[in-house]
Amino acid sequence: MKFCPSCASPLVGREMGDRTRLTCSSESCGYVFYDNPAPVVAALLEHGDTVILVRNKGWPEKWYGLVSGFLEKGESPEEGVLREVKEEVGLKGEIVSFIGAYPFSEMNQVILAYHVRGHGEIEIGDEIAGVKAVPPDKLRPWPLGTGQAVRDWLAARGGLGPTVA
């Protein structure tokens, strides 16, 4: 972002408290760009005796992660995670528990992760390039993003394996 969305003046960095924030260069405007993280929901999705991992279109061939997506306006995190499960893999979801909230600074997101049980037959959605069904004892957390939720879910089950680098 280079220009103020209110008056089109250039944005400049200014010290505000303990942070540098982009602010409007026009003294009469006062616009401040806070760059708040976007809320993302993620489902550690159990289907039968497996955990479902998905590969989004545009991801490298070997990358798989949890079903996840951005919240829609007016949607609760619980509604959002169930919608994402339906959109991405066609399953009716049932929330088992909240796993946790995780900062994902690299993408300027905060991830709200849920343990969800899926019912029905998997139907791959438009955004998904592939699906893997992984037995929980073979599931390994990855270091970024939703991998932290996998780590905590496995630890709560007493089955934490080594993190995949």
Specify the residue positions occupied by each region the protein language model found.
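A short coil-to-beta-strand element that immediately follows conserved catalytic motifs
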Residues: 14-15, 92-100
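Active-site-adjacent beta-strand/loop module that shapes the phosphate/pyrophosphate-binding cleft
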Residues: 100-123, 136, 153-154
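NUDIX/MutT-family hydrolases
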Residues: 124-155
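Short acidic/glycine-enriched loop/turn segments that link adjacent beta-strands
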Residues: 18, 60, 105-109
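Acidic, metal-coordinating catalytic segment for phosphate/diphosphate chemistry
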Residues: 1-42
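Conserved Nudix-box catalytic region and its N-terminal flanking loop in Nudix hydrolases
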Residues: 46-87
